[in-house]
Amino acid sequence: MKFSLENIISIRDFKKSDVEYILNLAEEMEPIAKSQKVCHEKDGKLLGVMFYEPSTRTRLSFETAMKRLGGDVVGFNQKQGTSIQKGEVLYDTAQIVSQYTDAIVLRHDMEGAARFVSNIVDVPVINAGDGAGQHPTQTMLDLYTIKRTLGELKNLKIALVGDLKYGRTVHSLVYALAMFNVEIVFISPSELEMPPEILRDLEKLNCKFSIKNSLIENIDDVDVIYMTRIQKERFPDPKEYLKVKGQYTLTSKNLKDSNTIIMHPLPRVDEIDFNVDNLSNAMYFKQAFYGVPVRMALLDSIIK
C-alpha cells in the first residue's frame, strides 16, 4: 500500500486507502513520538511553517513531528515581524519560503489558500486550516483517536456538537467518516447548522445523518461526542455570537455512568467543564498528543 497524494489540502482528496495507510503508519510512529525510539528519516530536511492565524496544537505538533523525524523547522507563527506587515502578498511569501524548505505547512484565514499555494510552488504543501474551509490533518488525528480508543472506525455513531457552520474541523471530518459507514448526529443551534452543501454531499455519499438540537438527550445514544467551540472570530456581528454562546456544555453530571468517548479539537471555551477532564472517557488531551504521530506519518509520506 502506498500513499497517493503529493499535497495535503483537503480530506476529499484522500482515497480510503490513503487514510488507512496514514493511520497504520502513525501507529508505527508512536514510539518515536514518545521518545522511546530515535528517528533520522528526515535528517537535513527543513519544514517551512506559515501561520497567518493563531495556533497552539497544530503548529507545535507539526514542529514536534518534524523534529522527531530528524528534520528541522523555520517559519513564522504570526504576521507581525514579517514582510506581510509591509504588504507582501501570499504568492510572494510562499515563493520565498518554498526556496528555503522541503515542504510548507500553511494556516490562513482565506478558504482555498492552501490549494492556491500548492499550485504555485514546487514543494509539498500541507493545509493546516484555511478559514472556515478544511483542516485535513486534524481529521486524520481525529480518526486515529477514534480507532486507537474504540479499536475500529466502521459502523459507529458519532455526534458533532456546537459550531457546525464555521468549524473547519467538522467540515473535514464528515467526509472521512462517510468513508467508514459512520452514522452522524449533528447537534447545534439553528444558526450554526452544518452548511447545506455539505449535507447534500453526504446524501450523495449515502452517509446516514440526523439533525438535532438537544445534546443531553443524545449522550448515551452515540459512541463518540465531538464537541467544538463557538468560533467568535468567524462571526461578522458580535451580537450574533452572544446569542449562541454557551448553549452546549458538557459536565461530569451530564456524563454520569456514560461510556461515550468525549473528543474536542481544542481550544475549548465553555463547552466542556473542567470537571470532565478526569473522566476515563475524556480523550481530548490524548487526541492532541496523537497529532504528533499522525503528522509525522503525513510528513514522512510527502517529504522525499
From Swiss-Prot:
GO molecular function: amino acid binding; aspartate carbamoyltransferase activity
Coiled coil: none
One Gene Ontology biological process: 'de novo' pyrimidine nucleobase biosynthetic process
Top enzyme category: transferase
UniProt catalytic activity: carbamoyl phosphate + L-aspartate = N-carbamoyl-L-aspartate + phosphate + H(+)
Keyword flag Metal-binding: no
Signal peptide: none
EC numbers: 2.1.3.2
Pathway: Pyrimidine metabolism; UMP biosynthesis via de novo pathway; (S)-dihydroorotate from bicarbonate: step 2/3
Entry superkingdom: Archaea
Claim: Cytoplasm is one of the keywords in the record: no
Residues annotated for carbamoyl phosphate binding in this entry: 57-58, 107, 135, 138, 266-267
Record keywords: Pyrimidine biosynthesis, Transferase
Disulfide topology: none
Residues reported in the UniProt entry to bind L-aspartate: 86, 168, 229
Reported function: Catalyzes the condensation of carbamoyl phosphate and aspartate to form carbamoyl aspartate and inorganic phosphate, the committed step in the de novo pyrimidine nucleotide biosynthesis pathway.
Family, similarity comment: Belongs to the aspartate/ornithine carbamoyltransferase superfamily. ATCase family.
Record text on subunit structure and interactions: Heterooligomer of catalytic and regulatory chains.
Database matches in HAMAP family: Asp_carb_tr
Name of this protein: Aspartate carbamoyltransferase catalytic subunit
